[in-house]
Regions:
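Non-catalytic C-terminal interaction segments of nucleic acid-processing enzymes
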Residues: 1-36, 141-145, 169-194, 204-321
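Interdomain/boundary linker segments immediately adjacent to catalytic/signaling cores
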Residues: 1-108
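Residue-level preference for long, well-ordered alpha-helices that form the structural scaffold
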Residues: 52, 192, 196-199
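Soluble or luminal CAZymes and related metallo-dependent hydrolases
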Residues: 55-59, 198-203
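Conserved catalytic cores of phosphodiester-cleaving nucleases, focusing on short active-site segments
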Residues: 67, 110-137, 142-193
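A structural signal for short, well-ordered beta-strand segments and their strand-loop junctions
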Residues: 75-78, 156-158, 218-223
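Short, solvent-exposed loop/turn segments at secondary-structure junctions
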Residues: 82-84, 162-164, 225-228
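Short, charge-rich binding segments
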Residues: 103-106, 146-150, 211
Length: 321
């Protein structure tokens, strides 16, 4: 397999799929004509990007609902992946095309902002002045209205998700033990399979810069099918800097089929906090999309499901700002 290094379009970056997450691989096939799919301006391959889109929408919605249902805080989409249309993949693509044409495609912002319910009226008023959440990525953060919005944020969130049942992963309960490769520090064998909170190397510097400039703490929230976990960016950085968490190279496939090798950090869930627990599982519904040439592409869509914010996560939010 040839790995191409190139500048990614924001649409491709948002929907790139880790090869580890693709369950069905067609090996030995250079080209599968039936997998070609024309969306709007670009030609795509396979349905994995549709699964990624549906999975991303579902996981962010589930975490947002968990925060909102707890009653003390509320979450709102902020970065492009959250503010883009969530019910039409064509509209999703065109949203990122518009972002790219505006010269904003490579601007990194956290996916969600979390506020206190006590500030909801002021936050809603400010967002309405900015023409709604979908327009936030097109407005400079130096704008006075954006400054007003950010002044009320308790925490900013970068969202990740994985198609795994966390509790069924083989090393879910395996205790950390001294590891030779880590200089005697606690860890697990390299091949251990357990829930991890993932941060990409390419995101580290932009997120650190944003956190420093905006003076709002960033947390990474990672949703699995049955549980979700969180960790602060500052704690993640300490684990990476100390060598407790090693870099891992992983291949990602973009919707158009191109592959890119990226460095990521898989932080053991035990280093973070339990964010939420699934109380009602989503349904996996068969769906399809028809391209402009009449080609039908089937995929599985995530529908419904509920999660409850943990007491530990509530305490983390209470401790901020």
């Amino acid at each position: 397999m040839t790995i191409h290094r190139r500048i990614e379009h924001p649409f491709e970056r948002a929907l790139s799929v880790s090869m580890e997450e693709i369950e069905i691989a067609l090996r030995g096939m250079r080209k599968a004509p039936w997998a070609e799919f024309t969306l709007n301006p670009r030609r795509l391959r396979g349905s994995d990007f549709l699964m990624r889109w549906s999975q991303g929408v579902w996981s962010e919605d589930r975490l947002t609902d968990a925060v909102n249902s707890a009653g003390k805080y509320f979450a709102m989409p902020y970065g492009p992946s959250g503010t883009a249309p969530d019910n039409d993949v064509r509209a999703f693509e065109l949203y990122f095309e518009r972002l790219e044409k505006a010269g904003l495609g490579n601007i990194k912002r956290p996916d969600l902002l979390v506020f206190r319910v006590a500030d909801k009226a002021r936050v809603d008023s400010t967002v309405n002045q900015l023409n709604g959440p979908s327009e936030l990525p097109f407005t400079a953060e130096e704008d006075g209205r954006m400054q007003e919005l950010l002044a009320h944020a308790v925490v900013a969130v970068e969202c990740e998700n994985s198609l795994w049942r966390a509790k069924q992963m083989p090393n879910y309960t395996t205790p950390l033990t001294p590891q030779k490769r880590l200089g005697g520090r606690l860890g697990l064998k390299k091949g251990a399979v357990l829930p991890t909170i993932i941060i990409k190397e390419e995101d580290r510097d932009p997120l650190r810069t944003w956190e420093r400039h905006r003076k709002i703490p960033i947390h990474i929230w990672h949703a699995f099918f049955d549980e979700a976990y969180g960790i602060s960016l500052s704690d993640a950085e300490k684990l990476i800097s100390s060598g407790d968490i090693e870099p891992t190279k992983q291949v990602f496939q973009a919707p158009g089929g191109a592959t890119t090798e990226k460095v990521i950090y898989k932080i053991y869930y035990t280093h973070g906090y339990l964010l939420a627990t699934t109380t009602e599982e989503p349904k996996l519904i068969a769906d399809s999309i028809t391209d402009r040439n009449g080609h039908i592409l089937p995929y599985v869509r995530f529908v419904g499901g509920k999660s409850r914010l943990s007491a530990e996560a509530s305490a983390v939010l209470d401790s901020m700002r």
